[in-house]
Amino acid sequence: MVQSELQLQPRAGRRADASNWGDFGSDKGGLGNTDIPPITPNSQRPPKLSNLTYDSPPDYLRTVSCPETCRVLFDYQPEAPDELALQKGDLVKVLRKTTEDKGWWEGECQGRRGVFPDNFVIPPPPIRKLIPRKIISRESAPIKETKKLMPKSSLPTVKKLAAAASAPGRAKTLSTPSGDSQKRPSRNSGFNGSCLNGGPRQPGRKGSRTQASQQHSASSQEDEQKSPGKGPSRSKTPTPEKTRLPDKVLAPETIPAPDKVSIPKDPVPKKAPDSDKIPATEDTTLDKAGTPESTLSGNKPAKDEALDLKMALHEDTAPALVKILTPEHMIFKKEPSRDNDQCQHLPQGGSTQRPESPAPSNNIQVPGEYSPPPDSSERSCCRVRQVNGSFPAQSKAEDVSAMEEANFLEEPLAKDERTLNKALPKKLPSERAGPQKQVLPQESAPTPQVPHTIQQMPVPEEAPTLHPLTPLTSPKSKNDRMDVLESLKEEVGLLRSRLELLELKLEQKMGDVWEELKTETLLSPEVQMMQRNRKSFKHAETQTETQTE
């Protein structure tokens, strides 16, 4: 109120001076006649000029068709009859903002009209006027963005149409856009193919390499069939690749492949000088074992023939060899591949050095064709034990592979008895290398020095002594195989029991989680209802408190 009174006093004095200004001039009369004419126009013109300059620039001060409503801040008591009385909180309609005096507006309040000072009133907030402008700007912004984006996407089509329509030459103009259109999709397709189809192209290249390697191996095997003397030297490169892959992947099909290829190569130069009939039989075994398309089912007869030769030729070496092979294969997996490589490198030295190879290495003591069955069975044992020790969770795939190998080993046992009577009368009288193989393990087992036995190699007179001793060796090898199969079955049973326990635990955990989810879903609406009830209760309490006050 003190500020309003201070502001009112100078304004009231000014309006009084302005209203009484003519009386003072008339009182002076003729005393100031010379001064009056220049003073009166100057005193009248400045307010006109000030009104013109004051009215023209701002638009909000002009009269508007829709009158504004202002709220009164301070009480105002009129001092002149044309002034309007104001009370705090009243609403005043502004009729005009241009009046004779600066800072005075004309308005209407409670059915009365008059002039009032503008600083006693608050105009409506300008935010209300700006709200529609902001909404329009927000709506127009995405429209502009879409307009900007559309021409970019349609630029290539527009350029093609313009190039096709504007060019006067018929043949030339038609050739250029078609050439561009043919070039562009090729570039795009190449680019997209390199970016998007980068993944599937790489396996294609790898597949082509593997096909080339398979073709190379097949061609090398055909060359071996044509020239048996040069066979071992050419087969050095494909066999280490085949032996490295099974060590990493542990696939049952690829493991016996190098053994099958290397088995018939060792006896080829040994048996070639003795008779001409034997290489023909060996070529048939090469065809069976060397083809890259052979599967496990196709390789069973080759293994059976190998087992028949072993059963016929060796008396006491079979159980010893099995005992020697088992610990090394259980500990080291990569030794058979290295030993097979040694078998392939050794034949270059000559036929006299070949009997020396069985003495230092245990895997090479197997004369040619007996190695694949213990390798496959014992490697499966290694896999099963590794699964028990380190990774019990990875079980289903390996159980299936172990069972397949077990079934695979059981089938040759039944076939061995049938094929013994057929294989022995054909090969034993013709092959004279049998006693040579029998002499080697008997003398090389106690002493590794074999040069004394090399002179005894060409003696072919001990062949008939093998016939009565063959049934003695077969039950031992069968018993060993049955022991291996029983151990495999026991390990598979243990794995299955562990898997069943894991399944039970997982089912229990899943059941617990499912029950927790159900309880949460049941509790969530109850919690929401409780929260709503609390809010409504608090709201009712606040209402009652306000009513009591």
Curated annotation (Swiss-Prot):
Residues 41-54, 343-365, 439-456 have a biased composition (Polar residues). CDD domains: SH3_D21-like. This is SH3 domain-containing protein 21. Residues 267-280, 332-342 have a biased composition (Basic and acidic residues). Gene3D superfamilies: SH3 Domains. It holds the Pfam family SH3_2. Keywords: Coiled coil, SH3 domain. Residues 65-126 form the SH3 domain. Residues 482-510 form a coiled coil. It comes from Mus musculus.
